[in-house]
Amino acid sequence: MRGGALLCGQVQDEIEQLSRESSHFSLSTGILPSLGARSNRRVKLRRFVVSPYDHKYRIWEAFLVVLVVYTAWVSPFEFGFLRKPRPPLSITDNIVNAFFAIDIIMTFFVGYLDKSTYLIVDDRKQIAFKYLRSWFLLDLVSTIPSEAAMRISSQSYGLFNMLRLWRLRRVGALFARLEKDRNFNYFWVRCAKLVCVTLFAVHCAACFYYLIAARNSNPAKTWIGANVANFLEESLWMRYVTSMYWSITTLTTVGYGDLHPVNTKEMIFDIFYMLFNLGLTAYLIGNMTNLVVHGTSRTRNFRDTIQAASNFAHRNHLPPRLQDQMLAHLCLKYRTDSEGLQQQETLDALPKAIRSSISHFLFYSLMDKVYLFRGVSNDLLFQLVSEMKAEYFPPKEDVILQNEAPTDFYILVNGTADLVDVDTGTESIVREVKAGDIIGEIGVLCYRPQLFTVRTKRLCQLLRMNRTTFLNIIQANVGDGTIIMNNLLQHLKEMNDPVMTNVLLEIENMLARGKMDLPLNLCFAAIREDDLLLHQLLKRGLDPNESDNNGRTPLHIAASKGTLNCVLLLLEYHADPNCRDAEGSVPLWEAMVEGHEKVVKVLLEHGSTIDAGDVGHFACTAAEQGNLKLLKEIVLHGGDVTRPRATGTSALHTAVCEENIEMVKYLLEQGADVNKQDMHGWTPRDLAEQQGHEDIKALFREKLHERRVHIETSSSVPILKTGIRFLGRFTSEPNIRPASREVSFRIRETRARRKTNNFDNSLFGILANQSVPKNGLATVDEGRTGNPVRVTISCAEKDDIAGKLVLLPGSFKELLELGSNKFGIVATKVMNKDNNAEIDDVDVIRDGDHLIFATDS
C-alpha cells in the first residue's frame, strides 16, 4: 500500500510539473505531438536526464545569456586593447568560463529533440554522441583560460578570447523566443534586437580599428597617431572612446574628416567595414520600415476600402442615404477592429468549448429574459447562446428590410431601434425596440416575409441567430420548441395590435393546417386548447399517449384545463384514460382538482379510475389544501384515502399538522390508522402529542378506546414521560406544510433540466437510498445533524399550560432572547420540565424537550 501511495504521489507530482510547464504561452516551449499520438511531454524521461523544456533548465539558460552579453563586450575589447590578461577582467573571465564549463557537463544530461521523429531522445549515449560531433569542440575551446592560451603563444591571447563569441548563438535563440512570447511587446523586442546588433557591430569595429593602429610598426602613421601623438601613453578609456567615435561616425556615414585611414591596412579594413555598413543599414531600415508599416497597415486598408466604396457608390448612382449607410458601416467596422472589439474573429479562432463558455458568460443572462425563451430548458438556452453572433450597427442603418426573406432574427443587447412600416409608400414608425427585445422572430418562426423594417436609432449591439441553425437545434428539443411557439402566440395575443392580431390569426390557421416548420406535438395543441389543431395532428397519426419531459400526456393537460372537446378527441383516438405522469397523477385527478365536473364525468364513462394514480398523494394534497369536499370526492370515486404517499406520510398525518379536526374525523371514519408510521417513524398520534393539539388528542383517545387498539413501543427507543416514543425530529416535508405556503405539485421549475430517467434508479439514487435506515427511524445524533430540533417552551410566571412549539436556536443566548420575546419577560434561566434541572448549554437539549423560562425573581 505504501509503495502504491508513493507511486501515486510521483505521478501526481509529474502531472503537476507538466501542467506548470504547459502554462507558458510561448510557441517555442512545447512539442507538438504527431497526429493520433499523445503529447511527448507526458513521457517520463530516464533517470538523470533533463528535458530541454524543463522550467529550471530554462532559468539556467537565461542566466547564461547574461554571461554571454558580458562575453560579447569583453572578448573584442581584450582582443584589441590588451596584450595580456589583466585583473579584474582575467578573474571575471575565469569565473564566466567556469559557468560555461558546468554547462558543457550538464549538456551530456539534457535530452534533445530528434528533428526526424520529433521525439525527445533520452538515451545518454545518443546524447553524448550527438553533442561530441556538433558543438562540443567549440564549447570546449571557448572555455580555455587566458593564462593557458598565453603558455601556447604570447600572440594567441586575443585570438582565444574571440573564440568565446561562439556563445552568441544563445542570444539569437533568446530573441527568437521573446518575439513569440505574449508577455513581451513584439515591437520593442525587435527594436532591442536591432539596437544590440548595432552596438555590437560598432564595438567590434572600434576594437579592430585600434588593433590595426596599435600593431603598426610606425604608430605616428595611423588614424589615431596622426591626431594624438604618443597615443599609447594615453589612458585606456580615452583610446576606447576615440575608437568608438570613429567607428560610429563611419557606420552612420557622417565622416567629419577629423579621423580617416592613413596607411594601406586601415584603408583596406575601412573598405570592408563600409561595405558591411551598407548591408547593416539595409537590414536596419528594412526591419524598422516593416514595423512601422505593420502598425499603419490597418489605417491604409481602411482608407483603401472607404475609397473603393465611395467609387462604387458614385459609379452606380446609389442614393445618398444608402451611401451614408455603407460608409458608416465601414467606419464602425474599422473602429471595432482598432479598439480590439473584433470579437467574431477572436471567437472563431478558439475551440467550441471555450467559445460556448465565453458566450454563456456574456449573453446568457440577457437571453434568459427574452420572452420567446421563457420556460425553456437550460440545455436549449445554452445551445442557442453558443450559436449567437454579436454584431455592431451604426445609427440609422437598416438591420432588417420589410418583406425580405426571414434568414435571421436578432436580440438587442444595447441601443434602440425603430420598427418602420414602408408598405404604404411613406415610412411610419410602428414602435420602438430597446435592449433585451427580440426582432425578426415572427418571420423566422412562421417562415413568412419580415413584417417591418428595423432601423437603428443609435449605435447598437445585436446578437444574430441564423434561422437554419435555430431550427436544427429546435428539432432536437421538441418540447422546448412547443414552449417557444406558445410564448410567441401568447405575446402576439397580449400586444393588442391590429397588425399582430392578423398575424396571430394567420399563424393559428397555419398551425391548424400543419404548415409550420417547427415540430408541433399534441401537448402543444392541448396547452393552446386548440381542438382543431389537435384533430389535425391526430389525423396525421401522432400518438395520443405521447408525453412531455415530465410524463404528462395531452389528456393530462386537456383534463387540467377543462377543455372538453380536446378530451373527447383524445379519447376517441384511444388515449389511455388511466395514464400516469412522473408524479403519479392521472387525468381524472387533474380534472377533479381543478373542479371540471363535465370532464370528470366523461373520463369516468371511459373507464378512468382514481386508483390508477397515486391515491395517497392525492389525499395528502387535498388535506394540505384543507379541501374536505375533494377528499370525499376521492372516496366517492373509489379511492382509499388512508393510503400513504411514497414518503409514508398519509392524509391523516397532514390533517393533524394542519389542525383540521373535521378532516381528521372524516379520515378516522374511513379507517385511517392513528399509529401508522411514516418513513421517519412518526405517527399521527405522535404529531398530535408533540404539537399540542388537545382536541385531536382527545379524538384519538376516543377512537382508540372504541377500537381498543394498544400502541406497542420498542424497547430500543427511549420513552418520554408523555408516553410518546422519542423518534427524533419530525421533518416538515412539503407534503405536510401549511396550505398557504404549499406549492401545488403540478407547478414545475421553469428552468429545470430535461429528465432522462428516475433518480432512484441511478447510481447516485441507489447510494442515497442506502443512507436511510431500513426501519425509518433515526438515532438522536442523526436527528440532530439532519434536522433542526423542536422543543416546547413555557414560562413559569405566565399561565401557559400547553406551551409553544418552536425550533431550537443555535446558541444559548439566542434561546434566552427567544423566551424573552415570546413571553414578554427578561429570561435569565432555562430549566427542563421533566427533571427541573437548569440548562446552560443548548447541546444538552434533546428533540421534544419541554423547556421552562424564568427570571431571577
Swiss-Prot record:
<feature type="intramembrane region" description="Pore-forming; Name=Segment H5">
    <location>
        <begin position="242"/>
        <end position="261"/>
    </location>
</feature>
<feature type="transmembrane region" description="Helical; Name=Segment S1">
    <location>
        <begin position="62"/>
        <end position="82"/>
    </location>
</feature>
<dbReference type="GO" id="GO:0009414">
    <property type="term" value="P:response to water deprivation"/>
</dbReference>
<feature type="repeat" description="ANK 3">
    <location>
        <begin position="583"/>
        <end position="612"/>
    </location>
</feature>
<keyword id="KW-0472">Membrane</keyword>
<keyword id="KW-0851">Voltage-gated channel</keyword>
<dbReference type="InterPro" id="IPR021789">
    <property type="entry name" value="KHA_dom"/>
</dbReference>
<keyword id="KW-0633">Potassium transport</keyword>
<feature type="domain" description="KHA">
    <location>
        <begin position="790"/>
        <end position="857"/>
    </location>
</feature>
<dbReference type="GO" id="GO:1990573">
    <property type="term" value="P:potassium ion import across plasma membrane"/>
</dbReference>
<dbReference type="InterPro" id="IPR045319">
    <property type="entry name" value="KAT/AKT"/>
</dbReference>
<dbReference type="Pfam" id="PF12796">
    <property type="entry name" value="Ank_2"/>
</dbReference>
<keyword id="KW-0406">Ion transport</keyword>
<feature type="repeat" description="ANK 5">
    <location>
        <begin position="647"/>
        <end position="676"/>
    </location>
</feature>
<keyword id="KW-0597">Phosphoprotein</keyword>
<dbReference type="GO" id="GO:0006813">
    <property type="term" value="P:potassium ion transport"/>
</dbReference>
<keyword id="KW-0040">ANK repeat</keyword>
<feature type="topological domain" description="Cytoplasmic">
    <location>
        <begin position="112"/>
        <end position="134"/>
    </location>
</feature>
<feature type="transmembrane region" description="Helical; Name=Segment S6">
    <location>
        <begin position="266"/>
        <end position="286"/>
    </location>
</feature>
<keyword id="KW-1133">Transmembrane helix</keyword>
<feature type="repeat" description="ANK 6">
    <location>
        <begin position="680"/>
        <end position="709"/>
    </location>
</feature>
<comment type="subunit">
    <text>The potassium channel is probably composed of a homo- or heterotetrameric complex of pore-forming subunits. Possible heteromultimer with AKT2 or KAT3. Part of a K(+)-channel calcium-sensing kinase/phosphatase complex composed by a calcium sensor CBL (CBL1, CBL2, CBL3 or CBL9), a kinase CIPK (CIPK6, CIPK16 or CIPK23), a phosphatase PP2C (AIP1) and a K(+)-channel (AKT1). Interacts directly with AIP1, CBL10, CIPK6, CIPK16 and CIPK23.</text>
</comment>
<feature type="topological domain" description="Cytoplasmic">
    <location>
        <begin position="1"/>
        <end position="61"/>
    </location>
</feature>
<feature type="topological domain" description="Cytoplasmic">
    <location>
        <begin position="180"/>
        <end position="193"/>
    </location>
</feature>
<feature type="topological domain" description="Extracellular">
    <location>
        <begin position="262"/>
        <end position="265"/>
    </location>
</feature>
<keyword id="KW-1003">Cell membrane</keyword>
<feature type="topological domain" description="Extracellular">
    <location>
        <begin position="215"/>
        <end position="241"/>
    </location>
</feature>
<dbReference type="Pfam" id="PF00027">
    <property type="entry name" value="cNMP_binding"/>
</dbReference>
<keyword id="KW-0630">Potassium</keyword>
<dbReference type="InterPro" id="IPR036770">
    <property type="entry name" value="Ankyrin_rpt-contain_sf"/>
</dbReference>
<dbReference type="GO" id="GO:0042802">
    <property type="term" value="F:identical protein binding"/>
</dbReference>
<feature type="topological domain" description="Extracellular">
    <location>
        <begin position="83"/>
        <end position="90"/>
    </location>
</feature>
<feature type="topological domain" description="Cytoplasmic">
    <location>
        <begin position="287"/>
        <end position="857"/>
    </location>
</feature>
<feature type="repeat" description="ANK 1">
    <location>
        <begin position="515"/>
        <end position="546"/>
    </location>
</feature>
<dbReference type="InterPro" id="IPR014710">
    <property type="entry name" value="RmlC-like_jellyroll"/>
</dbReference>
<feature type="repeat" description="ANK 4">
    <location>
        <begin position="614"/>
        <end position="643"/>
    </location>
</feature>
<feature type="transmembrane region" description="Helical; Voltage-sensor; Name=Segment S4">
    <location>
        <begin position="159"/>
        <end position="179"/>
    </location>
</feature>
<dbReference type="GO" id="GO:0005242">
    <property type="term" value="F:inward rectifier potassium channel activity"/>
</dbReference>
<feature type="transmembrane region" description="Helical; Name=Segment S3">
    <location>
        <begin position="135"/>
        <end position="155"/>
    </location>
</feature>
<keyword id="KW-0677">Repeat</keyword>
<keyword id="KW-0812">Transmembrane</keyword>
<dbReference type="InterPro" id="IPR003938">
    <property type="entry name" value="K_chnl_volt-dep_EAG/ELK/ERG"/>
</dbReference>
